[in-house]
Amino acid sequence: MGYTSLIMRLTSFTDYTLRTLLHLGSNPGRLVTIQEIADMHNISKNHLMKVVHELGRNGVIETIRGRNGGFRLAHKPEDINIGAVVRQSESDFYMAECFDPGGNPCGLVKACALKGVLSNATKAYLAELDRHTLASLLPEPAPRDGAVPITFHRKESQAA
């Protein structure tokens, strides 16, 4: 049986969180606006306001208010761990209803090994995310074609 899609799926909130961080990482030091990201990624400004608020609350970005305000990364991209960001933005990692203590109890829970398998899969998924930083997800800067270093030489004055 072939599997063509992942079962583990991030919420839209986490997807937008990661897109926001990738956008900020691609624009180092520059203040970015919610409108800019909303237009670039076709995301609702209202959703992005929640994302930006949460990223600011978690100390991942810094926000500057005012007419010329915006937001930028609060840390270097290599210091932002993707696993940590996903854990902060996802409400839970329940793979099945039996994982949720408040969910519908399953009659098979005492004899079922599926919960252990899914738990291990979730741990492996998060471990993979932990291996990456924002820097590792950013594209390499494009080489500037034809760029040649310029060296300036000063003429020495002629001594008599």
Sequence positions of predicted segments:
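C-terminal regulatory/oligomerization modules of transcriptional regulators
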Residues: G2-S5, I82, D100-A160
